[in-house]
């Protein structure tokens, strides 16, 4: 059991197989707890719709597909899905502003029209964080955000996320 104040960063550290990812999956509704509750702002995330939960919690997973046939902008725009109107409709100008802000925050403006498959590992990870930011969550969950990245890209990702105005829960197995 833990309580985390808004705007704080919680690092979950442990060796491979210790249950870090399982805990995170409980927090972003991939697994339903067999007992207890997961609450955000006093609301049990299993007592609200998946769409409402996706407006509260965004996750960047340790293993991401890399064969997207989408541009960086299209992937980041997927973060607006919990706010879509009707079947696939968008909130137009507001969504565009939020996507632009997420791209800017992750220093991806020059990449917006590039295909995901042409990016380096660090660039792809920044895209996935930008997609999560476009969800406008209260809580950002990062499962091994520096996994498979060289030291330069690890530092780049950590630098970009450290000042985000969100509650961040991240798992790490490498303390370096």
Task: Mark where each language-model region is.
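Conserved ABC transporter NBD signature motif
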Residues: 36-44, 53
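The feature captures the beta-strand-to-loop junction immediately N-terminal to the Walker
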Residues: 13-15
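Conserved ABC ATPase "signature" region
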Residues: 77, 92-111
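Helix-to-loop junction immediately C-terminal to a conserved catalytic motif
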Residues: 28
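Conserved catalytic motifs of ABC-family nucleotide-binding domains
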Residues: 136
């Amino acid at each position: 059991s833990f309580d985390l104040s808004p705007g704080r960063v919680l690092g979950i550290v442990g060796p491979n197989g210790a249950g870090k990812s399982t805990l995170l999956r409980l927090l972003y509704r991939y697994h339903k707890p067999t007992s207890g509750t997961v609450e955000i702002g006093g609301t049990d995330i299993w007592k609200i719709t998946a769409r409402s939960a996706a407006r509260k919690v965004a996750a960047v997973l340790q293993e991401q597909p890399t064969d997207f046939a989408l541009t960086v902008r299209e992937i980041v725009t997927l973060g607006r899905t919990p706010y879509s109107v009707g079947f696939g409709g968008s909130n137009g100008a507001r969504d565009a502003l939020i996507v632009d802000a997420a791209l800017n925050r992750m220093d991806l403006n020059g990449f917006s029209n590039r295909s995901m498959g042409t990016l380096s590992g660090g660039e792809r990870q920044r895209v996935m964080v930008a997609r999560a930011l476009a969800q406008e969550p209260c809580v950002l969950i990062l499962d091994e955000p520096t996994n498979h990245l060289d030291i330069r890209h690890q530092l780049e990702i950590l630098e970009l996320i450290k000042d985000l105005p969100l509650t961040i829960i991240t798992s790490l197995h490498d303390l370096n």
